[in-house]
Design a protein with these regions (language model features):
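Long, well-ordered amphipathic alpha-helical subdomains in the mid-to-C-terminal portions
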Residues: 105-161
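Helical mechanochemical/support elements of P-loop NTPase systems and associated helical scaffolds
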Residues: 4-7, 16, 31-35, 60-64, ...
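Flexible beta-alpha connector loops of hexameric P-loop NTPases
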Residues: 1-2, 53
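Canonical P-loop GTPase G-domain recognition
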Residues: 56-108
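Acidic-residue sensor for enzyme active/binding pockets
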Residues: 4-5, 30, 41, 122, ...
Length: 169
């Protein structure tokens, strides 16, 4: 991880902002949505603002905003920073998300065996974490994220058990 990624992640986990306004490049949607899905897993309300929609349309492409919002489980708005359009709407939606204080419920589900492993990790070692963060931590443990494993300081016997269930997949 870069220093910027570590600082950003630590802030989101430790400070728990009221909402996240995730501005992504509409011309490179796939790469940007990976981060978006990780943000949604944090349980913090997220608003996605897709930038460069004017260029997306100019290129003859389209993004189904309603479908994307449904799949992500959060508000999605179109913006163009160059033209200054949609920015007020994005800010308004982010404020509403922050004021609602309703935690995100991730819509994305993995295949059954992975979901089972994530649930097992949550039950085995995350009961001391806030409920809204448990899924994110479980996914990171499943991914064997070194920073998270170090932060959580999971005892060796639990780590061995988790690794054996991971190996079964």
């Amino acid at each position: 991880y870069t220093l910027e990624e570590v600082v950003a992640r630590n802030y989101l986990i430790q400070e728990r902002p009221d909402a996240i306004l995730n501005i992504i490049d509409g011309t490179n949607l796939e790469r940007n949505l990976y981060l978006t899905t990780q943000l949604v897993e944090l349980g913090i309300p997220v608003v996605v603002a897709i930038n460069m929609m004017d260029i997306v349309r100019k290129n003859g492409d389209q993004i189904r905003i309603d479908q994307l919002a449904k799949e992500l489980g959060c508000k999605v708005v179109e913006i163009s920073a160059l033209k200054g359009t949609g920015i007020d709407e994005a800010a308004k939606e982010a404020m509403q998300a922050a004021e609602s204080k309703i935690p995100m419920v991730p819509q994305h589900k993995f295949c059954g065996c992975v979901e089972h492993a994530i649930a097992h990790i949550e039950e085995a070692c995350l009961h001391d974490r806030p409920e809204a963060q448990q899924r994110w931590y479980a996914i990171k443990i499943f991914e064997r994220d070194d920073k998270v494993l170090e932060q959580l300081n999971i005892p060796d016997r639990k780590s061995t058990r988790l690794n054996s269930s991971h190996a079964e997949l």
